[in-house]
A protein has these predicted regions:
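Beta-lactam-recognizing serine transpeptidase/beta-lactamase-like catalytic domain environment
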Residues: 3-171
Length: 171
């Protein structure tokens, strides 16, 4: 949603039509409810998680722009949290992202992300589009109770600008 709002490819109150499914090549993609919603705004499509609308919006963005935002939100790379064993997740290479892959990635399939990446990307929206490095440690104290180290917020990158982030918060 934020990528499409940032790129002016969709507006919150723009009306879409959902027939309950969309054909992409030889695949039929349905909504999770398997029912059509008819006419609905983008805002309502986000609220109801309407797969077919996300497919339409991803097609407006295109694979290259869609991938740019996936990476901007930290998917496909480690967050840098201070614990071992963190996974990067799995994202199709751009060269292998066809129409079907783009369509299914638009609503969260054909992509593998970690719970920490998901939380961090949602936090980026709440932080006015800034993707921050997550941490488990706020501060370190010595045995007398003195703070010897305080973790400062570290911005990894801007995922989207503040205006689209606030629009997503309003959805």
């Amino acid at each position: 949603a934020s990528a499409a709002l940032e790129e002016d490819k969709v507006f919150a109150d723009e009306v879409f039509y959902d027939s309950g499914y969309v054909k992409i090549k030889d695949r039929t993609i349905k909504n999770w409810t398997s029912r059509p919603y008819g006419s609905l705004t983008f805002r309502k499509a986000v609220e109801e998680s309407v797969n077919t609308v996300f497919v339409q919006v991803a097609n407006r963005l295109g694979a290259e722009t869609f991938r740019k935002y996936i990476e901007a939100f930290g998917y496909g790379s480690k967050t840098g949290i201070e614990i071992p064993g963190e996974a990067e997740g799995i994202i199709y290479p751009l060269s292998k992202t066809g129409e079907v892959e783009l369509a299914t990635m638009s609503f969260g399939q054909s992509i593998s992300v970690t719970p920490l990446q998901m939380i961090n990307s949602v936090a980026a929206i709440a932080n006015e589009g800034k993707l921050l490095k997550p941490t488990l440690i706020k501060e370190i104290w010595d045995y007398k109770g003195n703070i010897i180290h305080r973790h400062e917020k570290e911005e990894v990158k801007a995922s989207v600008s503040p205006l689209p982030a606030s629009k997503v918060m309003d959805l």
